[in-house]
A protein has these predicted regions:
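Mid-domain Rossmann-like dinucleotide-binding core that forms the NAD(H)/NADP(H) cofactor-binding site
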Residues: 31-104
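Short helix-loop-beta connector
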Residues: 23-26, 48-55, 118
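C-terminal capping/lid region of NAD(P)-dependent oxidoreductase domains
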Residues: 198-208, 216-236
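Local beta-strand N-terminus motif with an aromatic residue
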Residues: 8, 52, 96, 119-120
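Short loop/helix-cap segments at secondary-structure boundaries that form the rim of catalytic
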Residues: 11, 89-94, 154-161
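Glycine-rich phosphate/adenylate-binding loop and adjacent beta-alpha elements
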Residues: 1-19
Length: 236
């Protein structure tokens, strides 16, 4: 959204931004998808080739990371991920080829070793622009760096060397700058993801649902305790 009213009981949105919800999907599940799920979809759409490619996803335990990992694996990418230990078993069960604890000083070296010492063809960074910039040397020639939290202001590597492509993601900016064609693609992606959620092909992050009066407490929990859960409030 590009204006106030995120916590309003009713709000107006353009018809082109609406998605039908399958009957098999709960209201809570439907509400938990668009922001993290479509952000992940946009991030992966920046990568021209995924099948067989080595893709590093940092912050893979976040709600966006959870969707990004699943969608990348569906497209045949060889995924490597950094996340807190509580997410490691789930990531390995999905088929992630290398998992490391981001708090370990050697986490990047561990994932590079898991990739046979080869550079990554793509990196999706869900942590910070500073980390993304620091990861550029781990990206191979003609590789793609996708940042979700901030942008790399200036490529620190020499020109005409690694020839990296730098991408930034801002789902909310589509409300101001997206064309009808882009909205049609985004909504189609959301509809397909909802169908996969209804069939069990895609899984949601853990949901924490509270009544509207609990909103201040839930916002505090997001800031202090967020570990990949998706926080929702019932408005009504």
């Amino acid at each position: 959204m590009r204006h106030g009213g995120s916590f309003a009981r009713h709000t107006l949105v353009p018809a082109r931004a609406l998605m039908p919800v399958p009957d098999a999907l709960s209201d809570e599940a439907a509400a938990a998808l668009p922001c993290p799920g479509l952000t992940a979809w946009q991030a992966l759409a920046k990568l021209p080739h995924l099948h067989g490619e080595a893709l590093l996803i940092t912050g893979a335990g976040s709600s966006v990371g959870r969707f990004a990992v699943q969608l990348a694996l569906q497209k045949g990418a060889r995924v490597f991920a950094s996340a807190s230990p509580r997410h490691h078993q789930w990531l390995k069960q999905l088929g992630v080829q290398g998992v490391a604890d981001y708090r370990d000083p050697d986490w990047l070296a561990q994932l590079q070793a898991a990739n046979g010492g080869e550079p990554f063809e793509g990196i999706i960074d869900l942590v910070s622009s500073q980390q993304a910039e620091a990861l550029l040397p781990a990206l191979g020639y003609y590789g793609h760096m996708v940042t979700v939290l901030g942008r790399i202001a200036r490529n620190p590597l020499p020109a005409f060397s690694h020839c990296h492509s730098l991408h930034e993601i801002a789902l909310g900016a589509q409300h101001a700058f997206g064309s009808d064609k882009q909205w049609s693609r985004l909504v189609a992606a959301g509809v397909a993801m909802m169908a996969q959620m209804a069939s069990g092909e895609l899984t949601l992050p853990p949901l924490v649902v509270g009544d509207f009066d609990a909103l201040p407490a839930l916002l505090t929990r997001v800031k202090q305790e967020g570990q990949g859960e998706k926080y929702l409030v019932r408005v009504g």
